């Protein structure tokens, strides 16, 4: 479910614009996507966990807001990110 420090560091290195870049929209979206993927696996075996489902919906909404911001500010970075994460088909 939750990401380990090593997993977070790997995501930051892969999607960050610099060495210690944890605040850029790309990194935030990538971290949220990893958390969302983990929760989706959790819900396959725990269908009645509505409390965690609320957290999942909150993460999805936050990711959507960050993607909208990135699309508005720098469309090329947005396209690159969704292609790398495989979010749109």
UniProtKB/Swiss-Prot annotation:
PROSITE patterns: RIBOSOMAL_S15
Keywords on record: Ribonucleoprotein, Ribosomal protein, RNA-binding, rRNA-binding
Gene Ontology molecular-function annotations: rRNA binding; structural constituent of ribosome
InterPro entries listed in its UniProt record: Ribosomal_uS15, Ribosomal_uS15_bac-type, uS15_NS1_RNA-bd_sf
CDD domains recorded: Ribosomal_S15p_S13e
A matching Pfam family: Ribosomal_S15
GO biological process entries: translation
Keyword Glycoprotein among record annotations: no
GO cellular component: cytosolic small ribosomal subunit
Origin: domain of life: Bacteria
SUPFAM superfamilies xref list: S15/NS1 RNA-binding domain
Function: One of the primary rRNA binding proteins, it binds directly to 16S rRNA where it helps nucleate assembly of the platform of the 30S subunit by binding and bridging several RNA helices of the 16S rRNA.
Family assignment from sequence similarity: Belongs to the universal ribosomal protein uS15 family.
Subunit (UniProt): Part of the 30S ribosomal subunit. Forms a bridge to the 50S subunit in the 70S ribosome, contacting the 23S rRNA.
Protein name: Small ribosomal subunit protein uS15
